[in-house]
């Protein structure tokens, strides 16, 4: 029997399916669920800006924070590929986006019946971040989407799900 589940999310539709399944399993077996998100520092800023717009992250974050999301589109003078180290403004925006993604996912999991839900974020390669969060949470199951937001990158470097599946020391459930 499983005793702790980690569900990884990047805010994509496939990740939402994984959250729903993980929440259902956590509720059924009455085990804790950790919702994990790897901050998206390696993602092109225009792609992040589009995601923030489509998912209404900008509006949600700006209700409580004073943030200039124009930095994602380049209007704020920055791009993730412009330097090897993102500016402090870019770090703040990506961190706030990550917090919003993980908090929405936790709310979704609770609404689906999970009773014990906590959250983690990581700043790492996506696969390594997920594996580290699973270890930190003491998870004996990882639930994640088959393919998230990084379709092009996964074609070049292999999918995050594939890497997690190959290196995890626990059960990995991949949702399509």
What are these regions (language model features)?
Residues 3-83, 112, 116-118:
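Small/aliphatic-rich secondary-structure junction motif
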Residues 12, 123-126, 149:
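Short beta->alpha connector loops
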Residues 15, 94, 98, 157, ...:
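Short, conserved glycine- and acidic-residue-centered signature motifs
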Residues 36-38, 120-124, 175:
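Conserved beta-strand termini and adjacent loop/short-helix elements that scaffold enzyme active sites
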Residues 74-142:
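Structural beta-alpha unit
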Residues 128-176:
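Gly/Ser-rich helix-loop-strand patches that form or flank binding pockets
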């Amino acid at each position: 029997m499983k005793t702790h589940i980690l569900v990884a999310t990047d805010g994509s539709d496939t990740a939402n399916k994984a959250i729903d399944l993980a929440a259902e399993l956590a509720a059924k077996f009455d085990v804790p669920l950790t919702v994990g998100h790897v901050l998206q520092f390696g993602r092109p800023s225009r792609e992040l800006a589009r995601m923030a717009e489509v998912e209404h992250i900008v509006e949600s974050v700006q209700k409580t924070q004073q943030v200039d999301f124009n930095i994602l589109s380049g209007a704020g003078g920055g791009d993730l590929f412009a330097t090897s180290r993102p500016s402090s403004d870019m770090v703040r925006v990506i961190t706030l986006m990550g917090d919003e993604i993980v908090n929405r996912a936790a709310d979704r999991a609770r609404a689906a019946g999970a009773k014990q839900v906590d959250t983690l974020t990581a700043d790492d390669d996506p696969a390594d971040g997920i594996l580290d969060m699973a270890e930190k949470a003491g998870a004996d199951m990882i639930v994640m989407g088959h393919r998230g937001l990084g379709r092009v990158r996964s074609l070049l470097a292999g999918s995050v799900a594939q890497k997690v599946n190959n290196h995890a020391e626990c059960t990995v459930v991949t949702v399509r």
